[in-house]
């Protein structure tokens, strides 16, 4: 899984966060796990 602080996409296209939460705000190209 993707560790906290690393890049992710909410739709899971880049893998799943260990925390299961990908934080992404409007306008961001990518989010990050937290």
UniProtKB/Swiss-Prot annotation:
Keyword Disulfide bond recorded: yes
Annotated S-S bridges: 1-18, 8-22, 17-33
Cited InterPro entries: Antimicrobial_C6_CS, Gurmarin/antifun_pep, Gurmarin/antimicrobial_peptd
SUPFAM superfamilies in UniProt: Gurmarin-like
Record-linked Pfam families: Antifungal_pept
GO cellular component: extracellular region
Cellular compartment(s): Secreted
Record key words, sorted: Antimicrobial, Disulfide bond, Fungicide, Knottin, Secreted
Domain of life: Eukaryota
Entry keyword Secreted: yes
Any single biological process term in GO: killing of cells of another organism
Family: Belongs to the AMP family.
Known role: Has antifungal activity against C.glabrata.
Domain notes: The presence of a 'disulfide through disulfide knot' structurally defines this protein as a knottin.
Name recorded for this polypeptide: Antimicrobial peptide Alo-1
Organism: Acrocinus longimanus
């Amino acid at each position: 899984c993707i560790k906290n602080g690393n890049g992710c996409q909410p739709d899971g296209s880049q893998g799943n966060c260990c925390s299961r939460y990908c934080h992404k705000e409007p306008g961001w190209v990518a989010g990050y796990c937290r």
